[in-house]
Regions:
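Conserved acetyl-CoA-binding loop-helix of GNAT-fold acetyltransferases
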Residues: 100-103, 109-122, 145, 149
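A short helix-loop-beta-strand connector motif used in the catalytic cores of GNAT acetyltransferases and
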Residues: 43-55, 71-77, 97
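Conserved N-terminal entry element of GNAT/NAT acetyltransferase domains
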Residues: 1-14, 18, 22-25
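Conserved GNAT acetyl-CoA-binding A-motif
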Residues: 124-136
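Conserved active-site alpha-helix within GNAT-family acetyltransferase domains
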Residues: 114, 126, 138-156
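Conserved GNAT-fold acetyl-CoA-binding loop/helix
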Residues: 21-44
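Conserved beta-strand-loop-alpha-helix junction that forms the acyl-donor binding cleft
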Residues: 108, 134-144, 161-162
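Conserved acyl-donor/pantetheine-binding loop and adjacent beta-alpha core of acyl/acetyltransferases
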Residues: 63, 69-100, 161
Length: 173
C-alpha cells in the first residue's frame, strides 16, 4: 500500500472528527484515549494556525488511513504540557503538543504513526520548536513504544483530562 502524507484543510475537520470517534468507539480501553477534539476545535485549530493535522491517505482508495494532530499551545495556555514538566516561562513558546494520533484498523501495520510523527517533527524543527511533548496512558504500550522508538522519553507521570493517569513524553529537537 502507498500513502500520501498531507496537511488537512479546515473543511476536512468533519472527516477527521469522524475518524477519531470511530477509533475511540472501537477501543476496548477507552480511558487510554481522551478524544476532546470536536469538529469546531479542529477547524479552529487549523484556521487560526494554532496547530496542524497531518493525514495519511491511502492512494488506491483515497480514504484517510490515519491522522496526527499537532497543537501549538503557546506560552499563555494553562494546558501547555511544558508547565507540567517545569519548563521555564521563556521556553513555553517552544513547545508543541503531539496531540492525537489515530490509524484506522484497516491500515494498521504500515508504520503510519511513525511516518506521520516524522513528517510533523520535520516541520516543527524547521519552525523552531524545541520541545515536542505528548501524553500516553501508562498501560497503552503500543503508543508508548511507538513514541519511544521515535526518540521520546518519559519525563513525568501526571493526572490529566479529568483525573486520568498519563505519562508525559518529551523529545528535544
Amino acid at each position: 500500500m502507498e500513502f500520501q502524507l498531507t496537511k488537512a484543510k479546515a473543511e476536512e475537520a468533519s472527516l477527521l472528527t469522524s475518524l477519531i470517534r470511530e477509533i475511540w468507539n472501537g477501543m476496548e480501553q477507552q480511558e487510554w484515549f481522551a478524544p476532546e477534539e470536536g469538529e469546531n476545535y479542529i477547524r479552529q485549530l487549523i484556521e487560526q494556525d494554532k496547530g496542524v493535522a497531518w493525514i495519511a491517505t491511502d492512494t488506491a482508495s483515497e480514504k484517510i488511513a490515519g491522522l496526527f494532530l499537532i497543537v501549538y499551545p503557546g506560552k499563555d495556555n494553562p494546558d501547555n504540557l511544558g508547565r507540567d514538566i517545569s519548563l521555564p516561562e521563556h521556553e513555553l513558546n517552544l513547545v508543541a503538543h503531539m496531540d492525537t494520533a489515530v490509524v484506522h484498523p484497516s491500515f494498521r501495520g504500515y508504520g503510519l504513526q511513525r511516518k506521520l510523527t516524522a513528517k510533523a517533527e520535520e516541520e516543527l524543527r524547521a519552525a523552531g520548536y524545541r520541545y515536542l511533548l505528548c501524553t500516553v496512558h501508562p498501560d497503552n504500550c503500543f503508543s508508548r513504544i511507538n513514541m519511544e522508538k521515535a526518540g521520546y522519553r518519559c519525563v513525568k507521570q501526571v493526572l490529566k483530562y479529568g483525573g486520568l493517569p498519563r505519562l508525559i513524553l518529551m523529545k528535544e529537537v
